[in-house]
Amino acid sequence: MVSGHSLSRRTMLGGVFALSAASTARAQDLTKASIALLRLSSSGPIFIAQEKGWFKEAGLDLTLKDFQAAAQVPLAVVSGDADLGVTAFTAGFFNLAAKGGLVVVAAQSAERPGYQLNVIAVTNAAWDAGVRSVKDLAGKRVAVTTVGSSVHYSLEVVAKKHGVDTKSLTIVALQTIPNMVAAFKGGQVDAAVFPITTFRQVEAEGSGKPIAYVGDEVPWQLGAVFTSPKTIADRRPLVEKFLVGYRRGAAAYHEAFGKRENGKLVPGPNYEEMIGILSSVLKQPPALVAAGLPFIDPDGRLDVGDIYKQVAFWQSTGQVARDADPKAFIDLSFVQGHFNVPGK
């Protein structure tokens, strides 16, 4: 005779094993994928979706691969080290894409009014000498990370808006943000284009003054989600599953951080949870994270025409091949409702 206690225990254990088997089966059903990225707030939708389990709900077992420099991210996708990538546009990115190595599928961050993401700042000495606006930069030494970078592009488009020919500037490429900070504080340059979180630390030390916030001056499509043509051809469902999770993350990010009034962030209803996730992932205090949150479209929609504009600019400087055609490396089929699509 089997006691009620033994039966209930067996039933319970059977249920546990069944749940475990079901979980294992679900895990085996997940598509394995990897994404190359920088551990910055602009990757926020990915961190949020990963933390909330939204990629798994979409059927994806996603591995995040961290890199230290933007140039490394598209190279990881081209080489096959990662299935997907997300980072800022650069001249190097467009050259890789033009050679058939990359396809843009959705938006990442963008410069927009009210989002103090990147800033053109001047040293105290330059300020005291009368450099108080972008127009005053003519003839000055301005630090950027690398020639062809998104930082360099920011300087170019803001200078153009104010009628400053960048040929009149001495653009000093210093490779890294710490090198830029050292040159700025040491007086080797008169100005620099800094990420806002870096500049706030410089400013707090009394070492510089802001003269222009890039997003307020010239809104532009800063970055994108991309993959390889081979991944789209052979594993399209992988990209589709990723974008389901990514867009959930982007929507949650936008709900928390997407409202601005008079250039100031107005926290959304899920702000505390989202800033907590990003603070933990980025290993930064919430206040510092909040100071550098970019605009990210909640649906992953691109400003397509602006990408064409960027390619044309880099072509005019000789840094991107003349035969590079954005239409060939932007796939509009994964996300609906992209903005400013040429020919529409």
Can you describe what each PLM-predicted range is?
Residues 125-133, 230-239:
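Short helix-loop capping/hinge motifs at secondary-structure junctions, enriched
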Residues 73-76, 91-92, 179-183, 199, ...:
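Short, hydrophobic alpha-helical packing/hinge segments within bilobed ligand-binding/sensory domains
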Residues 28-164, 171-174, 190-196, 213, ...:
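Short, glycine-/small- and polar/acidic-enriched structural segments
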Residues 2-19:
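N-terminal secretory signal peptides and thylakoid transit peptides that target proteins
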Residues 307-344:
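Conserved C-terminal helix/tail region of periplasmic/extracytoplasmic solute-binding proteins
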